[in-house]
Curated annotation (Swiss-Prot):
This is Ribonucleoside-diphosphate reductase subunit beta. InterPro entries: Ferritin-like_SF, RNR-like, RNR_small, RNR_small_fam. GO terms for molecular function: metal ion binding; ribonucleoside-diphosphate reductase activity, thioredoxin disulfide as acceptor. Keywords: Deoxyribonucleotide synthesis, Iron, Metal-binding, Oxidoreductase. The keyword Iron applies. Belongs to the ribonucleoside diphosphate reductase small chain family. GO terms for biological process: deoxyribonucleotide biosynthetic process. Disulfide bonds: none annotated. CDD domains: RNRR2. The gene is nrdB. Its cofactor is Fe cation.
Length: 346
């Protein structure tokens, strides 16, 4: 053997030794062999959706916002929607970087988490771009989670879920610790991204369906496509951890998760009532009661729990929008051509 060749073959990763959490014996820096193909597929799908908000024209939105066409109630919906999303994406990004990434010990899952964290940064950039374009008070929008009770209540709820996992002494190598980690994943993937965000998408995309605020609507369609992948990854991660650690999925944990989701539904309904005190064309607060309960049931089912509300979807067009997003070529609507690495100059 040549002197400069090390005998390190025994450190090559065995596929069957990989686990999603609590796997210190496997080198997390070695991506291959890939065991969790779903994680890699989510990463590839995310990379196929590269975009920046500045690639989308806001000209028509600016013109409409400065006109008298939008009612005060319509403006209220848009402003409170931006007030929630502007910091919510940062909360999700911080939880990925500071809480989830540390405790996920699988490289292909981590690869997607890095991609997701970047996307959360792009989403936060999006809300700044919208505020700047419309000439809104950026400080008021980005501080809404401290000034608006319905928004603060949702974000405080999310921060409660993060607290224990952010503790430097937190560990996942006990049943109780891993159960706490699962609750964190449910809080952010199922509740924040799977319930709170989807309710917010309905509000803005309903304007887009009426050919109003089309630039914002285009950006929200991008975000919706990202968030659909985020939700799918989160569901797969939760179910994967459950499968590898069946002892954690106790009746008590299941009941805790159901109660978390019930609380989230109540918070989202309060927020919808704040956004829509009188209702606007195509949207009423009462419709959001049904919608939030409907999607909560769908999220419960995806992690192996029974539905509890049994309400119908008052916005069937949202399902169509999600399906269309899988096929639509957003690149055709961009105002600037996407710069590939080969075209960059130094």
């Amino acid at each position: 053997m040549q002197a400069d060749i090390l005998d390190g073959k025994q450190k090559r990763v065995n596929l069957n030794s990989k686990r999603l959490v609590n796997c210190n014996q496997v080198d997390v820096n070695q991506l291959v062999p890939i065991k969790y193909k779903w994680a890699w597929e989510h990463y590839l799908n995310g990379c196929a959706n590269n975009w920046l908000p500045t690639e989308i024209s806001m000209g028509k939105d600016i013109e409409l916002w400065k006109s008298n066409v939008l009612s005060e109630d319509e403006r209220r919906v848009i402003l409170l929607n931006l007030g929630f999303f502007s910091t919510a994406e940062s909360l999700v990004g911080n939880n990925i970087v500071l809480a989830i990434f540390k405790h996920v010990t699988n490289p292909e899952a981590r690869q997607y988490l890095l991609r997701q964290a970047f996307e959360e940064a792009v989403h936060t950039h999006t809300f700044l771009y919208i505020c700047e374009s419309l000439g809104l008070d950026e400080k008021e929008i980005f501080n809404a989670y401290n000034e608006r009770a319905s928004i603060k209540a949702k974000d405080d709820f999310q921060m409660e879920i993060t607290g224990k996992v952010l503790d430097p002494n937190f560990r996942t190598d006990s049943v109780e610790g891993l159960q706490e980690f699962i609750k964190n994943l449910v809080g952010y993937y199922i509740i924040m991204e799977g319930i709170f965000f989807y309710s917010g998408f309905v509000m803005i995309l309903s304007f887009h369906r009426q050919n109003k605020m089309v630039g914002i609507g285009e950006q929200y369609q991008y975000i919706l496509r990202d968030e659909t992948i985020h939700l799918n990854f989160g569901v797969d991660l939760i179910n994967g951890i459950k499968e590898e650690n069946p002892e954690i999925w106790t009746t008590e944990l299941q009941q805790e998760i159901i109660e978390m989701i019930q609380r989230a539904v109540d918070l989202e309904i309060d927020y919808a009532r704040d956004c829509l005190p009188r209702g606007i064309l195509g949207l009423r607060a009462s419709m959001f009661i049904d919608y939030v309960q409907h999607i909560a049931d769908r999220r419960l089912e995806r992690i192996g729990l029974k539905p509890i509300y049994h309400t119908k979807n008052p916005f069937p067009w949202m399902s169509e929008t999600i399906d269309l997003n899988k096929e639509k070529n957003f690149f055709e609507t961009r105002v600037t051509e996407y710069q590939h690495a080969a075209s960059l100059t130094w």
